[in-house]
């Protein structure tokens, strides 16, 4: 088994696809590209793929991660660069693999690896208004977020 971590972009119209839709895109693209994946055991075997943090629908990203468990038992060697080329040829517009690494030994999951995210947000207001919002929030001791979930405020 060869553990491969891919880094990709998600830009353009594909940003409106949900996390689950993107997962289906990856599974289909891996199947079309004939990448030999490891599968789970049981009644409904699934490819062993791990996804990074779910990106909100509508957001673009330069740095999305996915871990693959590639079955290398029937091949003498697998070239990860060939995997990237094959996947990039079959991925939909807006998704592009821009990095790959082979994970050796025991390594932390994607969820454990991500310690921070950087967000670039465009606000359609003038700079002085946005600056006053930021100053007001930065001067608060605590920030309370209220939202409604299942008809109740949480």
Where would I find each of the regions flagged by the language model?
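Extended, well-folded interaction surfaces typified by the phenylalanyl-tRNA synthetase beta subunit core
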Residues: 2, 7-9, 13, 17, ...
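Short, solvent-exposed beta-strand/turn "edge" segments of beta-rich domains on protein surfaces
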Residues: 16, 58-59, 110-112
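Internal, well-folded beta-alpha domain core
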Residues: 77-154
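Short, charge-patterned binding micro-sites
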Residues: 38-72
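Short beta-strand-to-loop capping motifs
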Residues: 8, 68-74, 121-125
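Short, well-structured beta-strand/strand-turn elements
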Residues: 33-40, 98
């Amino acid at each position: 088994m060869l553990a491969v971590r891919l880094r990709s972009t998600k830009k353009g119209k594909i940003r409106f696809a949900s996390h689950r839709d993107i997962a289906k895109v990856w599974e289909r693209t891996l199947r079309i590209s004939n990448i030999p994946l490891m599968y789970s055991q049981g009644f409904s075997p699934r490819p062993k793929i791990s996804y990074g943090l779910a990106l909100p629908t509508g957001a673009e990203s330069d740095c999305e991660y996915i871990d693959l468990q590639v079955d290398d038992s029937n091949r003498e060697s697998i070239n990860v660069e060939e995997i990237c080329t094959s996947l990039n040829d079959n991925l939909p517009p807006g998704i592009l693999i821009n990095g790959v690494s082979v994970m050796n030994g025991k390594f932390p999951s994607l969820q454990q690896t991500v310690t921070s995210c950087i967000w670039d947000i465009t606000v359609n207001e003038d700079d002085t208004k946005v600056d006053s919002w930021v100053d007001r929030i930065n001067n608060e001791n605590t920030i309370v977020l209220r939202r409604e979930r299942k008809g109740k405020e949480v």
